[in-house]
Amino acid sequence: MEEHGVTQTEHMATIEAHAVAQQVQQVHVATYTEHSMLSADEDSPSSPEDTSYDDSDILNSTAADEVTAHLAAAGPVGMAAAAAVATGKKRKRPHVFESNPSIRKRQQTRLLRKLRATLDEYTTRVGQQAIVLCISPSKPNPVFKVFGAAPLENVVRKYKSMILEDLESALAEHAPAPQEVNSELPPLTIDGIPVSVDKMTQAQLRAFIPEMLKYSTGRGKPGWGKESCKPIWWPEDIPWANVRSDVRTEEQKQRVSWTQALRTIVKNCYKQHGREDLLYAFEDQQTQTQATATHSIAHLVPSQTVVQTFSNPDGTVSLIQVGTGATVATLADASELPTTVTVAQVNYSAVADGEVEQNWATLQGGEMTIQTTQASEATQAVASLAEAAVAASQEMQQGATVTMALNSEAAAHAVATLAEATLQGGGQIVLSGETAAAVGALTGVQDANGLVQIPVSMYQTVVTSLAQGNGPVQVAMAPVTTRISDSAVTMDGQAVEVVTLEQ
């Protein structure tokens, strides 16, 4: 009996020992798993397909191209940008360097905002010290932007000078050998990054031209107003005066914009010195990118489709098909839209839930046609309809009609789109700007800022005729009453505005 009790006790002790051993093993497994996860976070490369990243041959790798070579030759800031671009390309990222400084600034703001949100989520969910550090080693004022979890952020700020010094040394090791510059003129750069003259803003041109004159003339000051100091390449139609202000005649201002005149000054100077090659940076790459974007969009969107463009919070632009609400395409940036297009832009505002603007575009023949900077036949047709309506109201007797032919298919489509945009049949077409001024002149009203309102019902005939596939569209309309006002009047909660864009 006692032996049986001892055996049972030993058996229970063995079971408990096995249980303890199993618990210890589980603890070891959990500890190892947690440690391996942290190690993986610390040792893993930035992308799954990468091996341990080696920056010893950044600009000589297959990721380097003409863009990075051009940037690297522009100095320390360009070298830093080239290394960053080459790093992203080596990691198989489908992005390209934005050569337009204005668009690049907008992308920087958008992406920094996204980085802040991602970093806040990471530090909160994971509970690790993490920061974002952005550096551009320009002198004498380098860019050093750091944000993230404290106290790591403060620690990094403390070592700012050391980090900048080490970064400059590392970039200097990879910088290409300086080339002999056989030119008296400086390269066109904005914040150390090369830029094309056609992408420089007016403010940038006004600041650059005096510096350019120092190199071209060899004088410390331009000598504004002194004919003896005027360079031979200076345009004849631009006064030899300080470029900070436009002192041309009103006729000259109407003919050529001040920004375009400033660009002409820069182009003349560089052509005189035989350095046109410095005027256009990344030009070949941008032309190829635009052609690719135009080709891809034309294949994404079916022909004869009416779409709306929507700007998303993340900076992308979506093309939404009218009627179905389906997303036809999403573009990374509005700059990807083709620029060789001309169509009238039609806006309508819904004031019930707050003012909402939607840009309309028409796709014809498989090619995207979005309103940019030119007044097309469509806008002229709408303006002509407005003039006809005014003439009918003033010169014709009650009950008479006015007939007008629209021989342009583009104009007919624009009028049809205009009618579709009006949600209420009793709404009003509101004409503004140049069109309102022209109609105002016909009615004897000299106020160019007034608005002319025309009933939408006059366009129903156009819609019916288009649906039946008839030839030239004739619009018959009864006399209407024109009203000029200082503010837009909303009819039945809707208003339609025809915006005429001029270059």
Curated annotation (Swiss-Prot):
Keywords of this entry: Activator, DNA-binding, Isopeptide bond, Nucleus, Phosphoprotein, Transcription, Transcription regulation, Ubl conjugation
DNA-binding region: 109-305
A GO CC term assigned to this protein in UniProt: nucleoplasm
Disordered: annotated span: 36-57
Post-translational modification: Phosphorylation enhances DNA binding.
Cell location: Nucleus
Region (Required for transcriptional activation): 301-476
Domain of life: Eukaryota
Motif (Nuclear localization signal): 88-116
One GO-annotated biological process of the protein: regulation of transcription by RNA polymerase II
Gene Ontology terms for molecular function: DNA-binding transcription activator activity, RNA polymerase II-specific; DNA-binding transcription factor activity, RNA polymerase II-specific; protein homodimerization activity; RNA polymerase II cis-regulatory region sequence-specific DNA binding
Modified residues (Phosphoserine): 39, 44, 46-47, 52
Stored InterPro entries: NRF1/Ewg (IPR039142), Nrf1_NLS/DNA-bd_dimer (IPR019525)
Region described as Dimerization: 1-78
Numbered residues of crosslink Glycyl lysine isopeptide (Lys-Gly) (interchain with G-Cter in SUMO2): 139
Tissue expression summary: Ubiquitously expressed with strongest expression in skeletal muscle.
Description of how the protein assembles with itself and partners: Homodimer. Binds DNA as a dimer. Interacts with PPRC1.
Similarity annotation: Belongs to the NRF1/Ewg family.
Described function: Transcription factor that activates the expression of the EIF2S1 (EIF2-alpha) gene. Links the transcriptional modulation of key metabolic genes to cellular growth and development. Implicated in the control of nuclear genes required for respiration, heme biosynthesis, and mitochondrial DNA transcription and replication.
The name this protein goes by in its record: Nuclear respiratory factor 1
Organism: Homo sapiens (Human)
